[in-house]
């Protein structure tokens, strides 16, 4: 559990640093990370089911990402987080929006082309 917390902190720090690199978007990677942080245990297969707080964060993030630049930025942040988490279960990541009852216009994966997100 301590290792998972260290990893979450590392990802959060990376997202804060990477956030200003791209941006006409209002969303920062720090913001995105904050919304999906409750999902880390589930995505790393330490939780058997998607936590309610995770789905609340996914839903809130989806509601915030209204413009194409915001959706592309959220996508970039999620792809970056997926690549930074070596223990992530990619099938769980890809299925997370559906598990939370949210439709997003792209698949969460380590290789998603976020420039194609509209």
Curated annotation (Swiss-Prot):
The record's annotation in InterPro entries points to:
Bifun_inhib/LTP/seed_sf, Bifunc_inhib/LTP/seed_store, Plant_nsLTP
- The UniProt transmembrane annotation reads none
Signal peptide: which range, if any?
1-25
**Entry keyword annotation includes Secreted:** no
Keywords for the protein's UniProt record, in alphabetical order: Disulfide bond, Lipid-binding, Signal, Transport
> What pairs make up the disulfide bonds?
29-77, 39-54, 55-100, 75-114
User: Which PANTHER family does the UniProt entry name for this protein?
Assistant: NON-SPECIFIC LIPID-TRANSFER PROTEIN 2-RELATED (PTHR33076)
- Family designation: Belongs to the plant LTP family.
Task of the protein: Plant non-specific lipid-transfer proteins transfer phospholipids as well as galactolipids across membranes. May play a role in wax or cutin deposition in the cell walls of expanding epidermal cells and certain secretory tissues.
What name has this protein been given in UniProt? Non-specific lipid-transfer protein D
